[in-house]
Design a protein with these regions (language model features):
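Single, function-defining residue in the core of a domain
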Residues: 1-40, 77-79, 92, 105-107, ...
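Short secondary-structure boundary/capping segments
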Residues: 86-87, 154
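Short, basic alpha-helical nucleic acid-contact segments in DNA-binding proteins
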Residues: 66-81, 85
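Two-metal-ion RNase H-like nuclease active-site motif
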Residues: 93-103
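Short, positively charged, Gly/Tyr-enriched micro-motifs
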Residues: 19-71
């Protein structure tokens, strides 16, 4: 296999991740390359795709040592990753998606991601043992999310005011909403219908009494009661065909509730990281710190493939037709389009394979308006 693409990847990682030493950067490049080739994040499978770098067991042990290396500062690397991602973004306002995902009863991860074209780019994460109150981060859920968002915000340029979205399992608490206000970000979050809302005129109702099937309504006032009351705007919608309505709360009265649909992009990305792409669920990694390093590999690889999918929109029509049909360009995810184009370039024209990030809506997609 022509190694020019791997050499370019290694050079770019050395440039973009100055906190990594030379061998640490090379280990990250090898892991990313093996992951993309095999579409599996098991160390042994990744090693199988790197025969030119030594005997199978030699390469496997090298990847294991990288994954086990406590000197790799994942938080610092994520700062550098965020800077690289943001320098490649071509839209004005970021939408940050916060969600938790679990790998069975083994591990859980709290992740902050950047919404992009039907998917979400992992920016920063924290892993811990699943379903264990004793092993959950000591600061608790609210401070955990607050800390992750604070890190992401500090890595973004001054003056950038993102929109934060999260589901009711994370957002339904006065403490969480106050934390978001303290961060000085705009937010649009889903809350439970059991919450009580009081209008500016003093009329108080449960949200379950306010949301009506087939209707959409807005109101300004306070969510929750007494010492827990939070001022903001409520957006209620229950579209035909939905099992239940959406009860959305925001500190920005001008935000439309339809923008909350972007939160589902996070679910699609988790699917890509798992059964739809990197097979995260069969990684066999059980240590939270090792999983955080493996997630760095998956995030860099995922961002590159999304970029290739977006860059396909700038390619000539004859190149696009080699990757997907006209309908396929509309219906296939950018992740899958990027993977297809990567493999075609790798085997047909390896010299044309570029290692770059590019997060601009391609001409054949119409998601741009949702981010502006």
């Amino acid at each position: 296999m022509n190694p020019v693409g791997l050499y370019r990847l290694n050079a770019e990682i050395e440039h973009r991740f100055p906190s990594l030493g030379q061998w640490q950067a090379k280990g990250l490049a090898l892991a990313c390359w093996g992951l993309i080739i095999q579409e599996q994040c098991q160390i042994s499978r990744m090693a199988e795709s790197l025969p030119e770098w030594g005997a199978f067991n030699t390469v496997r042990q090298r990847l294991k040592r990288w994954l086990n290396n406590p000197r790799i500062n994942v938080t610092k690397a994520c700062y550098e990753w965020i800077a690289w991602v943001w320098s490649s973004c071509h839209f004005k306002r970021p939408v940050l998606l916060v969600d938790e995902s679990k790998l069975g009863d083994r591990l859980a991860v709290m992740m902050v991601s950047l919404a992009f074209e039907g998917r979400a780019i992992p920016l920063l994460w924290r892993c811990y043992y699943a379903n264990s109150a004793l092993d959950y981060p000591q600061q608790g859920q609210v401070l955990l999310i607050y800390g992750l968002l604070a890190h992401v915000l500090s890595a973004l340029p001054a003056g950038v005011r993102p929109l934060v979205q999260m589901d009711r399992g994370l957002a339904h608490s006065a403490a969480m909403l106050r934390a978001l206000k303290d961060l000085k970000v705009d937010f649009l979050v889903r809350v439970k219908a059991s919450a009580r809302f009081t209008s500016r005129r003093g009329h108080s109702q449960l949200l379950s009494q306010m949301v009506k099937y087939g209707e959409t309504s807005w109101a300004h006032g306070t969510l929750f009661t007494r010492d827990h009351a939070i001022k903001g705007s409520i957006y209620l919608t229950w579209e035909p065909g939905q099992a239940e309505g959406w009860c959305l709360f925001s500190n920005d009265p001008h935000l439309g509730g339809h923008r909350y649909a972007l939160r589902w992009w996070q679910e699609e990305s988790f699917k890509d990281l798992k059964s739809g792409g990197w097979q995260w669920q069969i990684s066999h990694v059980r240590c939270p710190q090792r999983m955080e390093r493996l997630l760095l590999v998956m995030a860099v690889s995922y961002g590159w493939m999304l970029s290739l999918g977006a860059l396909l929109g700038e390619a000539p029509a004859q190149v696009q037709r080699q990757v997907a049909t006209r309908d396929g360009l509309q219906t296939t995810s950018l992740f899958r389009l990027g993977l297809r184009w990567f493999k075609r370039l790798l085997h047909c024209t390896p010299a044309a394979l570029q290692v770059t990030l590019w997060f601009a809506p391609p001409a054949f997609r119409a998601f741009r308006c949702a981010l502006e």
